[in-house]
Amino acid sequence: MQPAARLLSRSVWKGPNIVPLPIREAMTKGTPIRTNARAATILPQFVGLKFQIHNGKEYVPIEISEDMVGHKLGEFAPTRKRFSYTQTKNK
């Protein structure tokens, strides 16, 4: 596991930012976990689970893989829309 840059910015004695989530229910039923906790650290127990992370407007569906461990949930749900220039015709 490679620690994320954000994970290193938090003091070691505080530990990772953990939010109580219904993990057992999600494992048994297979339902996605809806959360607004974008600052929660992804733990190894989350691998294989489906999350719906709030980006300020809607819930973005994400499935956790091993590469995501140590990162924050909010890193995978962008809050800003990409800008696309649309050219208009002058009449």
From Swiss-Prot:
A GO CC annotation given for this chain: mitochondrial small ribosomal subunit
Pfam families in the record: Ribosomal_S19
Keywords for this protein: Mitochondrion, Ribonucleoprotein, Ribosomal protein
Family: Belongs to the universal ribosomal protein uS19 family.
Function: Component of the mitochondrial ribosome (mitoribosome), a dedicated translation machinery responsible for the synthesis of mitochondrial genome-encoded proteins, including at least some of the essential transmembrane subunits of the mitochondrial respiratory chain. The mitoribosomes are attached to the mitochondrial inner membrane and translation products are cotranslationally integrated into the membrane.
Oligomeric and partner information: Component of the mitochondrial small ribosomal subunit (mt-SSU). Mature yeast 74S mitochondrial ribosomes consist of a small (37S) and a large (54S) subunit. The 37S small subunit contains a 15S ribosomal RNA (15S mt-rRNA) and 34 different proteins. The 54S large subunit contains a 21S rRNA (21S mt-rRNA) and 46 different proteins.
Protein name, per record: Small ribosomal subunit protein uS19m
Lineage of the organism: Eukaryota, Fungi, Dikarya, Ascomycota, Saccharomycotina
